[in-house]
């Protein structure tokens, strides 16, 4: 059975199970007169898939060989780091300060490990990406603890946001998958009404280069509360209706960086571990294709972070320069894969 889709409005929840012999299946969720398309195990090629993603569609795929291996590798690291404790129950066993210490060592180890990059390379090939033109940033290992334990700093629980508020290009595609089984109450939520509706926000105060220089390195210092300045909605965001996709371990969900989404408050009693990474396609970078800019005003660019799928080299300098905005003098080269927001 393919992933469950939950569309919530007020106190009413409807769940749709989409299968049909694991073939491509399109489910349209209606909000007013608007549609959000969900593709399950789609046979679209990468060009067609990116076009749909830039229109706000979401793609979900069953677990693939490389994706399962990446999740297995992540579990090996997680379980070794937290041994002898159950990683999904560490909130019941460890002081939060000790947990933060472990994560501060664990997460970079996963992010920068050569095996992580190699398995991402395999995932991209399995999903029909042209490795000579598809660039990715290194995968992040995310944690979402029960909200009364740790939800700041290195385990930040994200408020409703678009990744484009954080200087991501509009051609960026986000890939997300769970490492252990998840439930609707410890994943992430999309807020589909805002795909075309602007949200007054403070993204104009965010510069990616400044973030890397001043705020990125000290995430583990923010244990009780996170005081780092991040772009936020400056008006109340209607949380409902919202969409949650409950994927299988190694099942990948793809969506545009322009989607408004948030971390679901973890009320299921177990810690969620997930992996995410981002891709851009060279043709779209050159042509400045992508999702529409509804309300993003951040400066700087994350274009320096992406690695080519075929050989792990960076984007060409002249392609990156297309995204300069006058703040590039503040750019300080850093290890590829500086952490950026996601669940």
Residue ranges of model-derived segments:
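Non-heme Fe(II)/2-oxoglutarate
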Residues: 259-343
């Amino acid at each position: 059975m393919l992933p469950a889709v939950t569309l919530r409005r007020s106190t009413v929840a409807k769940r749709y199970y989409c299968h049909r012999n694991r073939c491509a299946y399109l489910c349209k969720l209606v909000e007013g007169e608007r549609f959000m398309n969900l593709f399950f195990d789609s046979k679209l090629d990468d060009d067609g898939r990116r076009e749909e993603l830039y229109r706000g569609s979401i793609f979900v795929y069953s677990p693939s060989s490389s994706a399962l291996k990446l999740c297995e590798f992540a579990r090996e690291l997680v379980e070794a780091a937290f041994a002898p404790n159950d990683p999904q129950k560490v909130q019941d066993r460890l002081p939060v300060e000790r947990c933060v210490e472990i994560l501060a060592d664990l997460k970079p180890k996963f992010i920068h490990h050569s095996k992580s990059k190699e398995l991402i390379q395999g995932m991209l090939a399995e999903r029909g990406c042209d490795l000579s033109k598809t660039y990715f940033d290194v995968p992040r290992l995310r944690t979402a603890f029960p909200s009364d334990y740790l939800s700041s700093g290195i385990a930040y629980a994200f408020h409703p946001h678009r990744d484009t508020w954080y200087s991501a290009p509009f051609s960026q595609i986000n890939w997300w998958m769970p490492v252990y089984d998840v439930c609707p109450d410890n994943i992430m939520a999309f807020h589909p009404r805002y795909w075309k509706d602007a949200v007054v926000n403070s993204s104009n105060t965010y510069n990616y280069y400044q973030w890397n220089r001043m705020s990125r390195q000290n995430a583990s210092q923010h244990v009780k509360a996170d005081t780092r300045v991040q772009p936020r909605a400056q008006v109340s965001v209607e949380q409902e209706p919202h969409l949650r996709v409950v994927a299988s371990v190694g099942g990948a969900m793809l969506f545009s960086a322009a989607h408004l989404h948030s971390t679901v408050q973890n009320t299921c009693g177990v810690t969620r571990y997930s992996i995410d990474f981002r891709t851009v396609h060279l043709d779209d970078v050159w042509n400045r294709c992508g999702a529409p800019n509804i309300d993003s005003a951040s400066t700087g660019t994350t274009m320096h972070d992406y690695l080519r799928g075929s050989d792990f080299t960076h984007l060409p300098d002249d392609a990156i320069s297309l995204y300069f905005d006058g703040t590039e003098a503040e750019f300080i080269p850093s290890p590829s894969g500086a952490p950026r927001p996601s669940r």
